[in-house]
């Protein structure tokens, strides 16, 4: 008898979807790569993948709010609508758009202020993240949920005004936003450890931020702008694969 394949579902925003990493797959309005970390992970595990990630998504777009795609008339239903109830593994990377993380950094670096909504506080973000996790757990109670942090954009090798058009003070500011996102992830997994865990991608990728010898994100000199590149997606998939294998051995 053939062994049943693992069922993986991936939800989230652009750091899961992989805009500007070829090949871009349909629906193109999702700006989703066939080589994002969910696809690479599914290949490693020989698993069935339901990739529901959409670039630009907020946490509310995962659970309750439809999402309008820019430059398109495509409307995405809340991602949870297509979450299979028999999922074994769920990955989530989201929350940055709720605090204007990347959009605010790009706007600042370009010197072109964007009309952005007021960001959430850390408590509000952690509460919203926790609510998303709870809804996913209700929909797929047998799944292990991995809350996958964002790859680091700014790190110890990032040189002000060279690797990114931001001065030291603004780099410190945006590093603080990244830290806020990390703290919200930590808070969200508290009391949910029986079925959910945080994957500390930010810390593990600080040595591969802008200005490093092997950056896992694109900068202003090429690649996906302040987003994961292919090397970054491969790194996240590798880290997740190792974590899942460790968890599987612990269950034997």
Where are these regions (language model features)?
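Alpha/beta-hydrolase-fold catalytic nucleophile elbow
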Residues: 93, 148-149
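Structural motif
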Residues: 7, 88-91, 144
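Short acidic/His/Gly/Ser-rich catalytic and metal-binding motifs that mark active-site loops
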Residues: 16-20, 59-62, 99-104, 154-163, ...
């Amino acid at each position: 008898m053939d062994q049943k394949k693992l069922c993986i579902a991936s939800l989230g925003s652009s750091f899961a979807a992989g805009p500007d990493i070829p090949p871009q797959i349909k629906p193109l309005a999702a700006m989703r790569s066939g080589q994002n970390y969910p696809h690479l992970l599914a290949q490693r595990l020989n698993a069935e993948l339901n990739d529901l990630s959409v670039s630009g998504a907020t946490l509310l777009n995962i659970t309750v709010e439809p999402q309008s795609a820019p430059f398109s008339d495509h409307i995405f239903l809340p991602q949870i609508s297509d979450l299979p109830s028999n999922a074994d593994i769920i990955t989530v990377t989201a929350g940055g758009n709720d605090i204007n993380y990347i959009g605010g950094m790009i706007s600042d670096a370009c010197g072109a202020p964007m009309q952005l909504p007021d960001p959430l506080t850390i408590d509000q973000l952690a509460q919203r993240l926790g609510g998303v996790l709870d809804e996913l757990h209700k929909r797929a109670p047998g799944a292990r949920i991995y809350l996958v942090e964002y790859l680091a954009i700014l790190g110890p090798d990032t040189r002000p005004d060279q690797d990114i058009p931001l001065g030291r003070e603004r780099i410190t500011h945006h590093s603080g936003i990244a830290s806020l996102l990390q703290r919200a992830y930590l808070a969200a997994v508290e009391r949910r450890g029986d079925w959910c865990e945080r994957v500390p991608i930010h810390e593990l990728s600080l040595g591969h931020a802008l200005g490093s010898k092997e950056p896992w994100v694109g900068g202003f000199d090429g690649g996906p702008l302040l987003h994961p590149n292919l090397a970054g997606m491969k790194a996240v998939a590798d880290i997740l694969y190792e974590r899942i294998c460790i968890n599987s051995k612990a269950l034997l």
